[in-house]
């Protein structure tokens, strides 16, 4: 079965979990690994992140969209350029995305974004029990995460859909332009734009820049690549 859940407050269980935080955690994870980072370690708190500082490690993330004091990078994927992060381990803490990862009980967890949409779909074709976990925003529904979930469901072309997956697929089918839909109607996108992150929204709504599938292994996202 394929299903979609939004901003779970309690643990969720499945065989293959796909964590989605379009704006911006999973987009940043995909970008960082695609640009040469050796791994991304998601953590819940700022304090936990700072404790992991050592040579070869970058402390990164945001609270309320802004880079915390003492951090090397924020949560803008545009900051994660090859010359800054290649060969480095990223410790990432964010308001939404890294929090929801802690609630997933799954045999495997992968990170999805529009940036690696086709690679994620290809990876999932061989999987049976799939749960698309939308991070949401501060525990609430996020339009952009649900829209990406719908895009994944649509491309998988499966019949064994839960109600959440059917709703996400129908929403995706109703949208003519995903980027414009997000920019015009997503409250989180509007807030990021008001804070000066319009380029982030543009970047995070770009499809298939990367052929990579970040997979969580022993608490670290590492890269899976497809030809």
Curated annotation (Swiss-Prot):
It catalyses: (2R)-O-phospho-3-sulfolactate + H2O = (2R)-3-sulfolactate + phosphate. SUPFAM superfamilies: ComB-like. InterPro entries: ComB-like, ComB-like_sf. One of its GO terms (molecular function) is 2-phosphosulfolactate phosphatase activity. The keyword Magnesium applies. Its cofactor is Mg(2+). Its EC number is 3.1.3.71. Transmembrane segments: none annotated. Keywords: Hydrolase, Magnesium. Belongs to the ComB family. This is Probable 2-phosphosulfolactate phosphatase. The gene is comB.
């Amino acid at each position: 079965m394929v299903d979609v859940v939004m901003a779970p407050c309690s643990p969720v269980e499945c065989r293959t979990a796909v964590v989605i935080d379009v704006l911006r955690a999973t987009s940043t994870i995909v970008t960082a690994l695609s640009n040469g980072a050796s791994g991304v370690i998601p953590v819940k708190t700022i304090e936990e992140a700072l404790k992991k500082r050592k040579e070869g490690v970058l402390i990164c993330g945001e609270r309320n969209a802004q880079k915390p004091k003492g951090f090397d990078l924020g949560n803008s994927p545009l900051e994660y350029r090859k010359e800054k992060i290649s060969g480095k381990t990223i410790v990432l803490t964010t308001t939404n995305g890294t929090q929801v990862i802690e609630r997933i009980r799954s045999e495997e967890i992968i990170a999805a974004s529009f940036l690696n949409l086709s690679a994620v779909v290809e990876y999932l074709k061989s999987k049976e029990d799939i749960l698309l976990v939308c991070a949401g925003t501060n525990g609430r529904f996020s339009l952009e995460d649900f829209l990406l979930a719908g895009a994944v469901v649509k491309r998988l072309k499966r019949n064994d859909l839960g109600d959440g997956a059917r709703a996400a697929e129908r929403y995706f089918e109703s949208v003519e332009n995903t980027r414009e839909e997000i920019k015009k109607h997503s409250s989180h996108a509007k807030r990021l734009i008001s804070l000066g992150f319009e380029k982030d929204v543009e970047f995070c709504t770009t499809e298939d820049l990367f052929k990579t599938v970040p997979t969580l292994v022993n608490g670290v996202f590492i890269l899976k690549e497809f030809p």
